[in-house]
A protein has these predicted regions:
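Paired small-residue
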Residues: 95-104, 301-309
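Juxtamembrane intracellular "pre-TM" segments in multi-pass secondary transporters
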Residues: 1-6, 182-216
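Structural signature of the two symmetry-related core transmembrane helices
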Residues: 73-87, 276-290
Length: 392
């Protein structure tokens, strides 16, 4: 494979687009369906959070299993599980949604790790940031049209929803089973390490390794904000005059896609920590959350400006931290440690629904988003680097 934009990689990005298209629809359908059935914010947050909360637990093992068996073998098995989860949505209610979200969470843990590890291993160092950025970009393209498609399904009847989930499951499976990846030229031998010792040692690295710790905390807090936005915007928009959740989510996703494509070459790919770059990213996150909070008073202009600011922040944060860690983590257990880092992103999105849901029940959506803005402001200070971090 030559470069992140070569034909084999474009095929992988197409698979990413198809896989995550279901979630772009589910992120709108589940809160609306839950609200229609009388579920409160806590229940809706629990169901939505179960997806990535489950993913979080399986990420580290996913990285280890993929390192042992290779991404393609794992990918093909996972696509079957994902198809079953999507079909389960079509024949159950809220209780079944919880089970389906958990199955989908397991699938996503292995799917995303398989694709990202395959991309990182196959690309030269100078192209890594572009590869990760394009992976992230294609995972967000469905968000440009998914929310509007979901609203159309909601208004037209759940039969359209059932047909859509089945179609996505089938097409994703076909594309996934024909995908190919180059094997990495060098890779640590699985036989040379004790997997169980490695795993528990790796959990300790989450705190002991300063690179992993700093990146994980930033990703955790950023993901809490993104999770709160994803879960509760469909319900928050209903309280706002002229507010439209479909337009908001589409605008935010479009911003992510455009930003990731236009800024992909500006994302650092040198293995160094760039404090000013990260502080600016967290400032965008804080301003975006504050705009969403204030929009209940200030109007829809602040609502949609918040979508743009949060979209830019989301476009930058994940690929920047992932690329940085791909350089500074020890090669022997890099895949497992990357799995732990991505698990922090999963945990954050889950907490955005599970923890912020009760806060919205007790206070209001506006107050909940105000708290998100405060958390992001704290992370601006956390992004400051007291000592120079270089690749060892």
């Amino acid at each position: 494979m030559n470069g992140a934009m070569s034909l084999p990689f474009l095929r992988l990005y197409l698979l990413v687009l198809l896989y995550f298209s279901a979630n772009a629809i589910l992120n709108v359908i589940i809160p609306l369906q839950g609200g229609a059935l009388g579920a409160n914010n806590t229940t809706i947050g629990l169901i939505m959070g179960a997806y990535l909360f489950t993913t979080m637990f399986f990420r580290p093992w996913a990285g280890q299993i993929i390192q042992k068996h290779g991404p393609i073998k794992v990918l093909r098995i996972i696509l079957i599980m994902n198809g079953f989860a999507l079909i389960l949505y079509t024949v159950t209610g809220l209780g079944g949604y919880l089970v389906a979200r958990m199955l989908q969470g397991v699938s996503t843990a292995f799917f995303s790790m398989a694709l990202q590890i395959g991309i990182i291993d196959a690309l030269p160092e100078k192209d890594r940031s572009q590869g990760i950025s394009l992976y992230s970009l294609f995972s967000y393209i469905p968000g440009m049209v998914g929310p509007l498609v979901a609203l159309g399904m909601w208004q037209g009847g759940m039969n359209y929803f059932a047909f859509g989930m089945i179609a996505i499951a089938l097409v994703t499976g076909v594309v996934g089973y024909t995908a190919k990846m180059d094997k990495p030229q060098t890779q640590p031998s699985a036989e040379n390490t004790d997997h169980h010792v490695n795993m528990f040692h790796s959990f300790g690295q989450l705190v002991k390794n300063p690179h992993l710790f700093k990146s994980s905390v930033l990703m955790l807090v950023g993901s809490i904000v993104f999770g709160a936005i994803t879960v509760f915007i469909p319900l928050y928009a209903e309280q706002m005059e002229n507010g439209n959740a479909g337009i908001y989510l589409m605008l935010m996703a479009a911003t992510v896609v455009i930003s990731r494509f236009t800024l992909r070459k500006r994302i650092p790919s040198d293995g160094k920590w760039h404090p000013k770059f990260m502080m600016g990213t967290m400032l965008l996150l804080a301003l975006g959350a504050q705009c969403v909070s204030y929009s209940i008073i200030g109007g829809v202009v602040f609502f949609y400006v918040g979508a743009v600011l949060l979209g830019v922040a989301q476009a930058i944060l994940y690929p920047t931290l992932t690329t940085y860690l791909s350089f500074v983590l020890p090669p022997l257990n890099r895949n497992v440690l990357l799995g732990l880092f991505i698990a922090m992103a999963d945990l954050g999105v889950s907490l955005g629904g599970i923890v912020m849901g009760p806060i919205a029940d007790i206070f209001s959506y506006s107050t909940m988003y105000q708290i998100c803005a405060i958390l992001a402001m704290v992370m601006i200070l956390f992004s400051m680097e007291r000592r120079k971090i270089l690749v060892r």
